[in-house]
Amino acid sequence: MNPRIRAAAAVAPQLQADMDPSAESIAGVDEVGRGCWFGPVFAGAVVLTEVAAVELLAEGLTDSKALTVRRRARLVPLIEDAATAWALGQASAREIDALGIRSATELAMLRALQRLPTPLELVLVDGVLPLRLWMGPQRTVVRGDSKCAAIAAASVLAKQARDGLIKRLASRFYGYGLERHVGYGTAIHRRALLDLGPTELHRRSFLTKLFAVNGSLT
């Protein structure tokens, strides 16, 4: 056996500990971009067999936040090929402002899950809060993106898709540094907002405090 696969197989039971062994179709779901000032929040949903999980772990699958851009990009096609099913969902900045970030995040997760072609026996949700919009069986997994291969895979797909979208939008919204911070609240982003004002894709509900101190939100 390949040493990487042997090592991954040794830790796979721990990483999959939150899965129901009697269930055959389990999806991991995770969000990306919850704290950003700009653009949509994304969610990924992935169904993996145990064999696929072990193979992906051997390739270095882990929480997307712990991966370099290059390693994450390399994992994306591997996840897409290995997964029984995968899908993405998103909720727009306008929906975030209208619904609030938690409800909008849940909407993105629901959209991802509804796009899966596979009927689900269980959904594993990253974090401590349940997915209120999902009517089927579910289980929350604290720090699930570092404990469950399906959730980690979902986070990688969502992160790669969202970051790619924001970087493509950087040329349309020039001057905000989106290609560098992909919408997060950095000093460069803050300065650009104060100089240029928010765009149509900024989350105005996130900027209220910034502009309350520094001027009008127009």
From Swiss-Prot:
Its cofactor is Mn(2+); Mg(2+). Its main location: cytoplasm. Its EC number is 3.1.26.4. Residues 24-218 form the RNase H type-2 domain. One of its GO terms (molecular function) is manganese ion binding. It catalyses: Endonucleolytic cleavage to 5'-phosphomonoester. One of its GO terms (cellular component) is ribonuclease H2 complex. Manganese or magnesium. Binds 1 divalent metal ion per monomer in the absence of substrate. May bind a second metal ion after substrate binding. Pfam families: RNase_HII. Keywords: Cytoplasm, Endonuclease, Hydrolase, Manganese, Metal-binding, Nuclease. GO terms for biological process: DNA replication, removal of RNA primer; mismatch repair. Endonuclease that specifically degrades the RNA of RNA-DNA hybrids. This is Ribonuclease HII. It comes from Prochlorococcus marinus (strain MIT 9313).
